[in-house]
């Protein structure tokens, strides 16, 4: 009788072990890899959603002044606090941390050419006009170009743009602080403004399918 009870206990233990193993195996198979999904989607431009925008200034750690986009398409970090050319409109490109930055006064987007030079462009749809925001441990933000990996927006002490191929994330020249324009109170700044993204054929087809 004692041998029979011992055998039943052993079989029950084996059965519970098998059930646990099966459950863990099913979970590992069915559980989606959200981290991989977020990484992949962050590399793509989101043309299905409306872009979120925010307005602020970018304070350069090295020049001690602010990034500005001038009417001649030049970009530098020589603007004083509250300068009309220092007011920047920042648009989200994906649900990640990629953004497009344009001057509120001129409408030119800050882009980077193949030589690593910062320039202003009227249209900013290319990847060379997209930057990934990287928040650093010192609370500054670095802006890495989406097309040219490892190339950062950076300025010298005189406010001149640095060649991007000479920049690194840890360098002071590539560090920025977001600031509201002078005269703007924190309570006056809306969390985000929504602007419609230009529709293409794929977007129109998606909207029609949603309505139907």
UniProtKB/Swiss-Prot annotation:
Main location per the UniProt record: secreted
Gene3D superfamilies linked: 2.80.10.50
Disulfide bridges in this chain: none
PANTHER family: FIBROBLAST GROWTH FACTOR
Role played: May act as signaling molecule during development of the midbrain-hindbrain boundary (MHB) organizer, and be involved in patterning of the nervous system.
Similarity comment text for this entry: Belongs to the heparin-binding growth factors family.
Name of the molecule in the record: Fibroblast growth factor 8b
Record gene name: fgf8b
